[in-house]
């Protein structure tokens, strides 16, 4: 199996750094959701894909609240594959090559 079996979680669905707003008061706001049920590693992979600042703090807090399965970091590329393919279709550029790199371990 590619990912550990667990019940679907409520996902933001479009959780990239542009949809994470950092308030002056230290609070964080998540905007523009495309909410759906899915594997909870997916939102974390999206944050990593587009370089969220303080990602290590975010993933540590997430894991503290709800521990992630062993090896979740190894599956980040798998969860990034779909958005990379979408971006390759929409924007071209290097997204197709990045999608191929993400898919290579699973070919």
Regions found by a protein language model. Give the residues of each.
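Short, well-ordered beta-to-alpha junction loops that form the rim of enzyme active sites
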Residues: 13-15, 81
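Active-site Asp-x-Gly
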Residues: 5-10, 17, 21-74, 93
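Hydrophobic alpha-helical segments that form the core
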Residues: 77-85
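ATP/Mg2+ or Mg2+-diphosphate-binding catalytic cores
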Residues: 87-107
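Hydrophobic, aromatic-enriched interface-forming segments
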Residues: 1-2
């Amino acid at each position: 199996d590619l990912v550990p079996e667990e019940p679907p979680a409520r996902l933001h669905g479009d959780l990239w750094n542009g949809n994470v707003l950092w308030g002056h008061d230290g609070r964080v706001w998540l905007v523009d959701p495309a909410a759906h049920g899915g594997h909870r590693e997916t939102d974390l992979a999206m944050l990593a894909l587009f370089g969220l600042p303080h990602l290590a703090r975010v993933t540590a807090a997430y894991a503290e609240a709800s521990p992630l399965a062993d090896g979740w970091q190894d599956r980040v590329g798998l969860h990034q594959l779909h958005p990379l393919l979408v971006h390759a279709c929409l924007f071209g550029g290097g997204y197709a090559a990045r999608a191929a790199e993400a898919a290579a371990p699973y070919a």
